[in-house]
Amino acid sequence: MTSKKVHVMVVDDSMVARSMIIRGLSAHPSIEVIGYAINTLDAKVKIPKLNPDVITMDVEMPGKSGIDFLKEYLPQHPIPVILVSSLNLKVFDALDAGAVDFVRKPASQDNMDAFVTTLTQKVLIASAAKVRSTPATAGTSPTQAPHLSAAPLP
């Protein structure tokens, strides 16, 4: 019995980073990288054709950022996205935009193995995520959406 591989699309404008991510993810027997995009415009065209289970996306790219792309695209097309960036300050923006997780790009080659291991684990977890579309009529951002709050303790 063979299990279905997780189909991943990599979106990154840096050829070096893109190649590293593709090579690292492809080394796992349960993951198949089915394509890549060099920016968000390219991603918008390729995502419907490739139909990935999970997308890894750089945050900072020319044109539209990964975060802006998620805010525009994810409400109508729910796909688990893991944002990848060298900027830790973008973590909350990424999650607020709908990313299921965030991975920090390594600052040096010394941390590459740990980065690939972390990203691979998060891709496998994200593949099981149930991402819901947001109704177009909602008119609220994720930070404005209703949330649960705990009652004060007695």
What annotation goes with each model-predicted range?
Residues M1-P154:
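Strand-loop microenvironment adjacent to phosphate/nucleotide-handling motifs in alpha/beta enzyme folds
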